[in-house]
A protein has these predicted regions:
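Small cysteine-rich, disulfide-bonded extracellular modules of the LU/uPAR three-finger superfamily
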Residues: 1-85, 89-126
Length: 126
């Protein structure tokens, strides 16, 4: 969980400020750990854009993405080696909510497509 979301969670549930859910959340691809501060290297250029991602209701402390997500093909250059994903509250800019390393890094060359299967992303409250 990001520093931003930790603060929102604490403020909301301890009654010091209210917060509302984002209208949508987006998966972003990173070539380095975005860290809890949201400062790691996100892919940019060459046709890259975050993709909206829907989640099923949580069960036993875990929520999973409800549908597959497919990014557009890298166009005009390589995206590099994707090592982490982030879940963001905006299509661009915005606030990092969650982040995690991929089980296996994936190099995206010009023309390659990055896909996430349904239930391929699990967010667990620990």
């Amino acid at each position: 969980m990001s520093d931003y979301l930790e603060n929102k969670f604490l403020d909301h549930f301890l009654g010091t400020a209210s917060t509302s859910a984002p209208s949508a959340v987006y998966i972003g691809l990173h070539t380095a750990d975005p860290t809890d501060a949201g400062t790691g290297a996100e892919v940019s250029g060459f046709g890259y854009a975050r993709k909206s991602m829907a989640f099923d209701a949580s069960s036993s402390g875990t929520a999973s993405n409800s549908a597959a997500v497919e990014f557009s093909a890298a166009s005009g250059g390589d995206w590099g080696t994707i090592t982490h994903v982030g879940i963001w509250d905006a299509l661009s800019g915005g606030n990092l909510l969650f982040h995690s390393a991929l089980t296996t890094s994936k190099t995206i060359a010009d023309g390659d497509i990055f896909k996430v299967a349904a239930s391929g992303i699990d967010i667990t409250a620990a």
